[in-house]
Regions:
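C-terminal catalytic histidine-bearing segment of alpha/beta-hydrolase fold enzymes
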Residues: 50, 61, 227-276
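Short alpha-helix in the alpha/beta-hydrolase fold that links the catalytic acid
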Residues: 216-225
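N-terminal cap/lid segment of alpha/beta-hydrolase-fold proteins
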Residues: 27-67
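Primarily recognizes the serine-hydrolase "nucleophile elbow" in alpha/beta-hydrolase
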Residues: 125-201
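Short substrate-entry loop that stabilizes the transition state in hydrolases
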Residues: 65-70, 75-117, 155, 167-168, ...
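Glycine/proline-rich low-complexity segments that form flexible loops, beta-turns, and polyproline
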Residues: 271-411
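Catalytic nucleophile-loop/oxyanion-hole region of alpha/beta-hydrolase
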Residues: 85-87, 92, 107-139, 249-255
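Short beta-strand/loop motif that positions the catalytic acidic residue
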Residues: 205-208
Length: 411
């Protein structure tokens, strides 16, 4: 039998590529999952047997001590309540969270046909209570425990949140004394029906794809209900991607969702135990109120503290006040301060739209006669109080601080 030399050469090249190519999630030794921790060591209520499927449990993934933020997340894999995508939407997610300083606990909840959805919800509630009862052991904070779910796991997280309750202080079981409420929630490509209100619905991060139309519609509806109830929420609907994308590794667009989630968790101040400071003040540029811009506090001594920005929309006041919106502001610590000057003139029209002279005290930020013309004159970023300063503008914010004023010079 003859062998084509070209085919042989190509086969050798292909073999070389296969040998040299790195394996995603590969390790020097086979992966050994952690031993599941039973949520009811003496048997779950309503258990119909004695197999693993009858024993709700969590698998524990703790971050290294030097990365631990004290934040924790119960991970609920999807699977239509008939199976669980434990690796794809469980272990891989938990490892990602652990690498970012967040303790992760993959939930083995009960599924059909032996059990009902209500049993899975009971397992999710028990997981929240179990973590609070063992917070010292796992080095997590009892008021920074959330839940992330995918597909059916997303529905489970919603159902658990909507039906959560306070603990029973007189219960014999220390776990039953704990609250089952979620401090925050992350929902991936799943939807749920439920009565949204500020008591039972925690701050929530949503992500889905437009291709996964049915689930995207349900998530938009839930987000809208939360928005109407003034509950903090953030939603991302990516254009491409079918149902069940997991981390979406390798997708340059959809694969951004884990970092967006982390940014949201950080912005919610869920990665520190420090309370926010209700800070406000004034900003001056060259001795005058800053016409229009922003002030940003960037943490220097705590890499997981939330960076915060307040906007100065000085369209109807002679002073350049800044204050933070829904959240009071930064947490105590050292910060680098950035002040942005966006434009000399706030208005884009070149005449008084009300056909009257503009009162001087209402347009103190306008430096030209009348309403002025459109301009981007002198758009600056100030990182120092004065251009000749050797060091950046920094401050230390302490607990109890309420007002902090700033003045920068352009020359």
């Amino acid at each position: 039998m003859s062998i084509n030399k070209t085919s042989l050469a190509l086969a050798c090249v292909a073999l070389t590529v296969l040998i040299a190519a790195p394996r995603i999630f590969a390790a020097d030794t086979p992966y050994v999952p952690p031993t599941p921790v039973l949520l009811w060591p003496d048997g779950a209520p309503g258990a119909t047997g004695n197999s693993e499927e009858d024993k709700p449990a969590i698998s524990v993934y703790l971050p290294d001590a030097d990365k631990n933020t004290g934040c924790a997340i119960v991970v609920c894999p999807g699977g239509g309540f008939t199976h669980r995508a434990t690796d794809y939407e469980g272990v891989i997610i938990a490892e990602w969270l652990r690498s970012h300083g967040i303790a992760a606990f993959v939930l083995r909840y009960r599924i059909h046909p032996l059990y009902k959805n209500s049993d899975a919800v009971a397992d999710a509630h028990r997981a929240m209570q179990f973590l609070r009862a063992h917070a010292d052991e796992y080095k997590i904070s009892t008021d920074r425990i959330g839940m992330i779910g995918f597909s059916a796991g997303s529905e489970l997280a919603c159902l658990a949140a909507f039906s959560a309750a306070d603990g029973k202080p007189d219960a014999t079981d220390i776990i039953d004394r704990q609250s089952s409420r979620l401090n925050f929630m992350v929902l991936g490509y799943g939807s749920s029906q439920g009565q949204v209100n500020r008591t039972n619905t925690p701050p929530t991060f949503f992500f889905c794809t437009a291709e996964d139309r049915g689930h995207a519609t349900g998530m938009i509806d839930l987000f809208t209900a939360m928005y109407d109830a003034n509950i903090p929420a953030e939603i991302h609907i990516f254009p491409n991607g079918e149902h069940g994308v997991g981390l979406a590794n390798g997708d340059a667009v959809l694969g951004m969702w884990p970092q967006l989630m982390y940014n949201w968790i950080r912005a919610q101040n869920l990665l520190t135990a420090s309370p926010r400071v209700n800070l406000s003040g004034h900003v001056k540029l060259d001795g005058q109120p800053l016409p229009h811009g922003s002030i940003t506090f960037i943490p220097l001594d705590n890499p997981v503290a939330p960076p915060v920005t307040a906007y100065i929309m000085n369209s109807d006041t002679p002073t350049a006040d800044y204050k933070f919106g829904r959240d009071p502001g930064p947490i105590p610590g050292k910060y680098r301060v950035e002040i942005r000057h966006d434009a000399m003139v706030w208005m884009s029209n070149n005449r008084d739209p009300f056909n009257r002279a503009a009162p001087a005290d209402r347009i103190a930020h306008i430096r030209s006669p009348g309403w002025g013309a459109p301009t981007i004159d002198k758009v600056y970023l100030f990182t120092k109080a004065h251009p000749s300063d050797a060091n950046d503008l920094t401050v230390e914010i302490k607990p109890g601080d309420k007002e902090m004023n700033f003045e920068v010079s352009s020359k």
